[in-house]
């Protein structure tokens, strides 16, 4: 009998722990998102916009690949490889439909520190200059790309390790002000690194703490060595790029295909340099020989991994944070969801696999992602199509870029960073919404400028956590509860029909980046629970019971509810008397709740609001001033609802 029980228990245990076919399929779809969206790809609707976007993206990938490779202190051809392989890997494993992965200015700048430290410029004279190595490049160039590939490999390993540890759920501590300040500071560093090319100067590599200021000190000390030809060509290139891009932005609704000014400028500058022999006549530095084809894969040198661990951590964190911000932005814009942990895996594998093909560290770039928005891309097919055109450049067009002046390439980098640099304008909104966030932005930017992007990011996160820890003990409670007593208090004064369509929620906790998402989830869960449990079916019709629930839930019941009860008006009153403080993320989530409910025909009224909260919400959300939404008390809000009900009834009778 005991043996039979053991056998039965063993069979039950093995059945519970044996993976079913459906579980394996579900796991594959979760870890390979391409299996989820590719079978449902609509060729008729999506292929044309994805193709157009892919062609435009390829232009950006090629130009930025060449430029960011130089920024990473390696030969430009390796930037072309970095524009190809990471995009393919991310299209398979990534969840962002509009995220363009490839070379990235910030990760290139970080990896350049390792390249210049381990293989400095003065080693060029000590290594053989023969072209017998891979791709026909010198041993010096190959040593440099080996270091950059090692940074990419180790950075990818760190990202995959963070995926295994499920650290994606901890990324909420990296707030929007910290990301904005870090990327703006890093973009300022990138512009500074291009000054020597813009001015045509010969300058030693300068890095380390306060290196930003040492570069400008060197420029002013050697101002006489500036090449006027390079300066004029740089200014002309920047003016042309800015003007044409602004015109493209102004007329993008009228013209379906914008002018690829980066590509036109590269062709024109290369042709002019070739015809006038600027390299020898004026001493302009050019890109030089671009090898054809893709070399056989080779593992990065493992013996130098310990020497690049600092840069690898910087690449892993900075690249992931910047990419995740873009992925979350696109998901919010186009109404889909992403998994923060899956993004760790996607970017980690992009860096690991690409490092075997002589690629520099990769991440998503703001300019390329914005380009996908503007050209109407639908899916990652646009990125895969761009890879086809990058391959054409690698195998056919690459050698024609020999005569491209470096000052023109630097101009393309500087103008391409415009989206990051104009984030200085965020200072105004942070000042108006929350001055502490303004202080975090400024201090994070200063630390990034004085040290590096990874140091600035770390400082911003630590500073944010310290401030929240210091503020949270002052909060009275961290719970959200239904304010039933207020319902009973006003029930004798107002008719029951009014109260059936009103839900009163009391928020008795601070609303900051730590709990903004949970606030939204708890709010919706509470509304669903209260509508499901607390309203008796025999007292209220089924339509009345579910109207507010259907309006606020994310299910597919909205149309049905609106059809069955077209004249019902629902109200949600948020009692904000428990607000002790808030930040930019909290105000953003509160405005999002207001907008979501408004889109579902639910009026949101806020009671007991402080003057600072009213000012912040009005400034952030551009709220409709014609309808009052802020009230001194919950009773005042309910009285407002009751008067509106009476007015609507009077208007209905008058129409009859």
UniProtKB/Swiss-Prot annotation:
UniProt KW keywords: Anion exchange, Cell membrane, Disease variant, Endosome, Ion transport, Membrane, Transmembrane, Transmembrane helix, Transport
The annotated region (Membrane targeting) lies at: 641-656
Q: What reaction does this enzyme carry out catalytically? A: chloride(in) = chloride(out); iodide(out) = iodide(in); bromide(in) = bromide(out); oxalate(in) = oxalate(out)
Write out the GO cellular component annotations: apical plasma membrane; basolateral plasma membrane; cytoplasm; endosome; lateral plasma membrane; plasma membrane; recycling endosome membrane
Where are the Cytoplasmic topological domains?
A: 1-75, 166, 224-227, 276-306, 365-383, 470-656
* Regulation acting on activity, per entry: Is active at both alkaline and acidic pH. Activity is inhibited by 4,4'-Di-isothiocyanatostilbene-2,2'-disulfonic acid (DIDS - an inhibitor of several anion channels and transporters).
Please give the biological process terms from Gene Ontology that the record holds. Answer: bicarbonate transport; chloride transmembrane transport; chloride transport; gastric acid secretion; gluconate transmembrane transport; iodide transport; monoatomic ion transport; nitrate transmembrane transport
The record's subcellular locations are: Basolateral cell membrane; Recycling endosome membrane; Apical cell membrane; Lateral cell membrane
Q: Entry's Pfam families?
A: STAS, Sulfate_transp
Topology relative to the membrane = Multi-pass membrane protein
Q: In which tissues is it expressed?
A: Expressed in the thyroid gland (at protein level). Expressed in tonsillar high endothelial venule endothelial cells (HEVEC), placenta and in testis, expressed in a subgroup of basal cells in the epididymal ducts.
What factors induce this protein? Answer: Up-regulated by hyperosmolarity and down-regulated by acidic pH.
Is Thylakoid one of the keywords? no
**Domain STAS residues, every copy:** 492-641
Linked pathology: Disease-causing variants in SLC26A7 have been found in patients with thyroid dyshormonogenesis and congenital goitrous hypothyroidism.
The similarity comment for this entry is: Belongs to the SLC26A/SulP transporter (TC 2.A.53) family.
- Name listed for the protein in its UniProt record: Anion exchange transporter
> What is the species of this protein?
Homo sapiens (Human)
